[in-house]
Amino acid sequence: MMENGIWKDALIQSMKKLSPKLQVKNPVMLLVYVGAILATSLYFLGFFGISDEKAGYTLAIALILWFTVLFANFAEAIAEGRGRAQADSLKMARKDVLARKLKNLEDKSDVIEVASNDLKKGDIVYVLANEQIPMDGEVIEGAASVDESAITGESAPVIRESGGDRSAVTGGTTLVSDWLVIRVTAVSGESFLDKMIAMVEGASRKKTPNEIALQILLVTLSIIFLAVSATLLPFTEFASKQAGAGSAISITNVIALLVCLAPTTIGALLSSIGIAGMSRLNQANVLAMSGRAIEAAGDVDVLLLDKTGTITLGNRKASEFLPVDGVTEQELADAAQLSSIADETAEGRSIVVLAKERFDIRGRDFAEMHAEFVPFTATTRMSGIDYQGNTIRKGAADAVRAYVSANGGTYPKECDTIVSKVAGAGGTPLVVVRNNKVLGVIYLKDIVKNGVKERFLDLRKMGIKTIMITGDNPMTAAAIAAEAGVDDFLAEATPEAKLELIREYQREGHLVAMTGDGTNDAPALAQADVAVAMNTGTQAAKEAGNMVDLDSSPTKLIDIVRIGKQLLMTRGALTTFSVANDLAKYFAIIPVLFYGIFPQLEALNLMDLTSPTSAILSAIIYNAVIIIFLIPLSLKGVKYREMPAGKLLSRNMLIYGLGGLIAPFIAIKLIDMLLTVLGIV
């Protein structure tokens, strides 16, 4: 907790937070703050003989109340200090640099140098290797390696290029190679880096709806206890006269009783719990645009997960050559390798490697063959090679069928059987055709990640439904979904289908989370309750999401849900503990405080506390000290366990509810004994 001097800064901030302007933000602790001021005033009145209050006792109460306020300030300051430490490293990346602003896009020598802080949206800048990108933007020309370690912590450079889903760049990152022409999409103060700094510092953190609702409950309880405490002075004065025994309660004891009964424990820690939750998300390299998004993550019960990269490893691998009748496996492998020689994808390279391993088929002299490679396009959905009068194509089954038919050939039914078999096994079939004759099928296998099935099982135990999103055909999607253990799948997914699926679940009352990186994902991201945009994605995707994953890892969504649930669990557990504490303190203080007037209350003095003075001091010391003991838990969070909500609630009620009842009885009695031994009371 005490990393690199954060505690020193927290101590200083704790004192600064004694300002009334800051104390007003926390109504429960404001009550303690006012109580401390009143007790201090009563001490001076008693010291100079103006009041009947015992000066020494009143001073002790006043000091303990001031420490209670300071401990609450310290909890918040520690949480904020962690954020500031994180923000300081980010600020080092935010420097005002000179940018080359292009006057004419066609002439890159026609530039004017302007400060990055003076750039406006729509300005075009030209950035060269080893220069810092001056402001957030969209690459409109060029391709280059970019070092984003200042923001993501990842040392390996990433590729940024115009077009596609890798066109967004972030101000403060550095070009490692080549050059880029960038259209500025943010102004100074509104950049991605500025938002990150504001969020981790807590400067822009607003209270979430759940926080506000809980604070209203705590304030209501405090007002009730305030009203009860205010009536005790006239009530005990009247009761003591009627009983002819005892005496009226002192104002100091009324203040102490009010502070003990008010929900000060959770009131002191509520802010630090929220800040720490945001900090845990930042440590996972995820930037949340609001605390509401983190809370929503904790309530999510439907996860939409991309197949590639999340459920499967992402690189399909050639595992078999399946020829049709009349064609040998080696003949198919030879044609498949020729069609893949110029294919730079992982799938293409795996086909070349498999042919080499199975049949020792080596490279050829393509210059001598007068070979012409045909690249894959979204229109043809095929790639291949033309050489010495021969034509080889490989691609999706329906694309090859259309190609063969268009060229007057015959597509064998046997090939359909092989394609169905491969798809049914969860693989991707690529059909190979040479000179308009179908040779067979390449079996590309999708490899499901290790341990993913167990993770989905844990999510199911928690009541979270998992849905795999894939562009594969329904048969392939069903096979992979069964192997991975997801609850459902959406095959041949389009942006419109994803958007409609989210709306359908939301109409049924579910909270939906999803990830996305492309402009076509933006509508679905905007609709989802928790929308995690990839940092490598487009500007449109980032703006549509309410979180950004700096690591651009699709599996991070599961971790985000875990952090959200941990935040809600921590707040609920400490609220339960605080309320249970108040109940225990009630039994500790009330009987001892009033048995002089009502002797029957002696039977309720379960802890056999020495005296009313000792009881009050013991309870109020415990009330302050317990805040310090709970600060690590509020920052670290309650340990998250994958189990149904009902079991989780029962477990936490047992630990924090029953624990909250027992702990004060033991601690207050021990403090009472210590005060007695030391002769303080």
From Swiss-Prot:
UniProt binding sites for ATP: D343, E347, F376, T377, A378, T379, T380, R381, M382, S383, K394
HAMAP family hit by this protein: KdpB
PANTHER family: POTASSIUM-TRANSPORTING ATPASE ATP-BINDING SUBUNIT (PTHR43743:SF1)
Catalytically driven reaction(s): K(+)(out) + ATP + H2O = K(+)(in) + ADP + phosphate + H(+)
Places the protein is found: Cell membrane
Binding-site residues for Mg(2+), renumbered to this chain: D517, D521
Superkingdom as given in the UniProt entry: Bacteria
Enzyme Commission number(s) from the entry: 7.2.2.6
Segments crossing the lipid bilayer: 30-50, 59-79, 216-236, 255-275, 587-607, 615-635, 661-681
Keywords: ATP-binding, Cell membrane, Ion transport, Magnesium, Membrane, Metal-binding, Nucleotide-binding, Phosphoprotein, Potassium, Potassium transport, Translocase, Transmembrane, Transmembrane helix, Transport
Gene assigned in the entry: kdpB1
Active site: D306
Membrane topology qualifier: Multi-pass membrane protein
Lineage: Bacteria, Bacillati, Bacillota, Bacilli, Bacillales
Protein name: Potassium-transporting ATPase ATP-binding subunit 1
Family according to the record: Belongs to the cation transport ATPase (P-type) (TC 3.A.3) family. Type IA subfamily.
InterPro entries, per the entry: ATPase_P-typ_cyto_dom_N, ATPase_P-typ_P_site, ATPase_P-typ_TM_dom_sf, ATPase_P-typ_transduc_dom_A_sf, HAD-like_sf, HAD_sf, P-type_ATPase_bsu_IA, P_typ_ATPase
Major subcellular site: membrane
Entry keyword annotation includes Nucleotide-binding: yes
Subunit architecture: The system is composed of three essential subunits: KdpA, KdpB and KdpC.
Molecular function via GO: ATP binding; ATP hydrolysis activity; magnesium ion binding; P-type potassium transmembrane transporter activity
Role noted for this protein: Part of the high-affinity ATP-driven potassium transport (or Kdp) system, which catalyzes the hydrolysis of ATP coupled with the electrogenic transport of potassium into the cytoplasm. This subunit is responsible for energy coupling to the transport system and for the release of the potassium ions to the cytoplasm.
GO CC field: plasma membrane
